[in-house]
From Swiss-Prot:
Subunit structure: Monomer.
UniProt subcellular location: Cytoplasm; Secreted, Cell wall; Mitochondrion
Residues bound to AMP: A214, K215, K219, G238, G312, E343
Residues that hold CDP according to the record: G213, D218, G237, G337, F342
Main subcellular location of this protein, as a coarse class: cytoplasm
GO molecular function ontology, one term from the record: phosphoglycerate kinase activity
Residue numbers binding ATP: A214, K219, G238, G312, E343, D374, T375
Listed name of the protein: Phosphoglycerate kinase
């Protein structure tokens, strides 16, 4: 799956055409009030660009929450239509469904350049292909119904644009099922692909990956794939304790230990050696007597280990120095997962120091990419999103890319040629 060879919105001629844009308007709601409109704002450049190029009409489609294949007013996109009108400064016609006669009739009578927002795609089981019954058991959608649903979505479009990177790892109907000749990436999707291509297809070296997070078992595939690509790998966060216990027989007290992941540590370290990857682990820790923002704190080195009833919640000053040295050497950096419990101020120093080093690296012209999820939250919390090369909008999608998996939503896009 090539990331750098996908058709982009700028390669399209949309004049007089019916344009379908899959956006990510999965915004947090409090009742009918949108509490954060960032995802809507992020989609504006693509919508405005298409609108400026005189399409017949634009149809916007998204999911919101998990309505589980049935209509549920709690997950209606109606409030999004109102917000979008404000942001665009023009009328947005909200349709009460995403397929069916009402939708067909509305688009057939569209005024030139009209913008429609469809109701939540996930009101139909055919979007995700399955739902859960009241006992939590998976119920599969009828394949014929899925086919019909996809045909109905396709009938609204001459051109398809996908700007929902956060859902790109899901083979949902609106992501892979529109059979039109040109399927292009919107500006958000294009930026994601461009930066991940810079890291995964043709990185400037030295290439450093920074991994944090709790469980080794969640990140085995990620570490395994990155060991074929990087020159240096920092393993921090909770999963460092599993590595330290297995490799150095270090006492870790009540720190996180991942029984399942532990079985893979030696194989991963062997692979790092074989591939000449410098593996960098923390050598000292900020410890706590409990998992709490008001915990008593102490410090421990890896030579002493962490005493019983204490746990490591951040890396210590010597580790910070090691990590900063690696960052200073690197020309390409991918960071997924914080090195400490940054949510508690007492254990945020490791994360803040690493973030400062990453910002400095980006300011020096290096490529610094933050995978979505917790690390993106860190970048937002400390107000440095604009200072880094790229902060991904898709936690799960960016993780699967870094694991070396193909993303169905990207595979479905047309290639440039």
């Amino acid at each position: 799956m090539s990331l750098s060879n996908k058709l982009s919105v700028k390669d399209l001629d949309v004049a007089g055409k019916r344009v379908f844009i899959r956006v990510d308007f999965n915004v947090p709601l409090d009742g009918k009030t949108i509490t954060n409109n960032q995802r809507i704002v992020a989609a504006l450049p693509t919508i405005k660009y298409v609108e400026e190029h005189k399409p017949k009409y634009i149809v916007l489609a998204s999911h919101l929450g998990r309505p589980n294949g049935e209509r549920n007013d709690k997950y209606s996109l109606a409030p999004v239509a109102t917000e979008l009108e404000k942001l665009l400064g023009q009328k947005v016609t909200f349709l009460n469904d995403c397929v069916g006669p009402e939708v067909t009739k509305a688009v057939e009578n569209a005024k030139d350049g009209e913008i429609f927002l469809l109701e939540n795609l996930r009101y139909h089981i055919e979007e995700e292909g399955s739902s859960k019954d009241k006992d939590g058991k998976k119920v599969k959608a009828d394949p014929e119904a899925v086919k019909k649903f996809r045909q109905e979505l396709t009938s609204l479009a001459d051109v398809y644009i996908n700007d929902a990177f956060g859902t790109a790892h899901r083979a949902h109907s609106s992501m892979v099922g529109l059979e039109v000749p040109q399927r292009a990436a919107g500006f958000l999707m294009s930026k994601e692909l461009e930066y991940f291509a810079k890291a995964l297809e043709n990185p400037e070296r030295p290439f450093l990956a920074i991994l944090g997070g709790a469980k080794v078992s969640d990140k085995i595939q990620l570490i395994d794939n990155l060991l074929d690509k990087v020159d240096m790998l920092i393993v921090g966060g909770g999963m460092a304790f599993t590595f330290k216990k297995i490799l150095n027989k270090m006492p870790i007290g009540d720190s996180l230990f991942d029984e399942a992941g532990a079985k893979n540590v030696e194989h991963l370290v062997e692979k790092a050696k074989k591939n000449n990857v410098e593996l960098i682990l923390p050598v000292d820790f900020v410890t706590a007597d409990k998992f709490d923002k008001d915990a008593k704190t102490s410090s421990a080195t890896d030579a002493e280990g962490i005493p019983d009833n204490w746990m490591g919640l951040d890396c210590g000053p010597k580790s910070v120095e090691l990590f900063q040295q690696a960052v200073a050497k690197a020309k390409t950096i991918v960071w997924n997962g914080p090195p400490g419990v940054f949510e508690f101020e007492k254990f945020a120093n490791g994360t803040k120091s690493l973030l400062d080093a990453a910002v400095k690296s980006a300011e020096n012209g290096n490529i610094v990419i933050i995978g979505g999820g917790d690390t993106a939250t860190v970048a937002k919390k400390y107000g440095v999103v604009e200072k880094l090369s790229h902060v991904s909008t898709g936690g799960g999608a960016s993780l699967e890319l870094l694991e070396g998996k193909d993303l169905p939503g990207v595979v479905a896009l047309s290639n440039k040629n």
